[in-house]
Amino acid sequence: AANDGKKKYGYYESEEKIIENMYNATGLERGIRHPAVYLMEAADDITYIGDDIEDGVKKGYIDIDTEYERLKKRYKSQQKNFFISCDNYFEQINEKMSKSDQLNAKARYFRNTIQGYLINKAKEEFLNNYECIMSGDYGNVALLERDSNMKSFIGELKGITGRNCFGCREVLALELVGHKVITGLLDILVPAVLRKDCNYEDTKQYEGKIANIISSNYIYIAKQDYNYESKDDPMDEKTRKLEELSDYEKIHLVVDFVSGMTDSYAMNLYQELMGIKLPYQ
C-alpha cells in the first residue's frame, strides 16, 4: 500500500477490508491515530535508545564518558534533573570501581536513567494532552518530539549510536549477510510458488518440496478468502487451494513467511536450500 509520504508503510492492499472493519469497530476515522499508537511509538524509541547505547559501550564502539560530556554540555540546562542524577552516580563509581568496571556500570546506569526519564516525559506529555489525543486532534507528531528541545535531545541520543555503531565493520557485515540471506530466500521461494500448472501437495515435484517448507500457519492464513461472506453463517470461512491464489497472494505468502523468521532460522534455511549444509547437521 502507498505510504502517502509517511515514514512507515501502512498495510497491504489485500488487507483493506480487515482495516476497514477495524476502523468501524474502533470508531476511528482515516488519518486519525489510535491513542495507544502514541504510547507504543514512545515505548519503542525509549527501549532502543537506551539499549543500543549500552550495547555500543559493551562492544567498545562508544566512549560513554566522551559522549556523556558532549550531551551534558549541550543539554544540561534543559534536562537538568537527568544530568544531576547521572553526575552523582558517576562520581561514586569513579571512586569505587576500576576503569574497566566503570564503563559497564556507567552504561547500565545511563540506560536505566534515560529510559526512566523518557518514560516520565512521555507520560507527562500524554496526560497533559489527553483530551486532544483522545479526540484525534493531536496529529502525527510523536509524544517525545512535540517539544522542540526534547526532539533535539532525542535526536542527539540516537546520534550517539549512529555516529559510533552504524558504520562499524560488524554492523555493516551483518547487514550484508542479512541482505544476502533475505534476497536468496526470496529468489528461491517466489519463482517456485509462481510456477503454473503444478501440484503443491506433490512433494516429488520441486515446487511441492518448496511449498512444504513454508510454515503451515502462513499457508492456512493465505488460503482464507476474506472477501467471502456466507449468507447463512457470518463466521463461516471459505478455504481455497494454494493453486487458486493469485500471484499477488502467493508473493504475499512468501514475504510473510520470510519476514516472520528469526535471524538464526533464516540463516539455517538459506544454508540448507543453497546446499551449504545438510538439514540434519
Tell what function each PLM region has.
Residues 78-140, 197-202, 209, 218, ...:
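Polyanionic (Asp/Glu-rich) segments that form extended negatively charged tracts
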Residues 1-108, 119:
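Sequence-structural signature of the catalytic-core scaffold of metal-dependent phosphohydrolases
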Residues 28-34, 45-59, 124-136, 163-174, ...:
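Intrinsically disordered or highly flexible coil/loop and linker segments, enriched in small
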Residues 31-39, 107-111, 115, 146-153, ...:
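Secondary-structure capping and boundary motifs in well-ordered enzyme cores
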Residues 127-231:
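Substrate-recognition/cap regions that form aromatic- and gly/pro-loop-enriched pockets
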Residues 24-35, 99-105, 161-171, 247-255:
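Glycine- and acidic
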Residues 203-272, 276:
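C-terminal amphipathic alpha-helical interaction region
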Residues 44, 182, 258:
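Divalent metal-coordination and catalytic microenvironments
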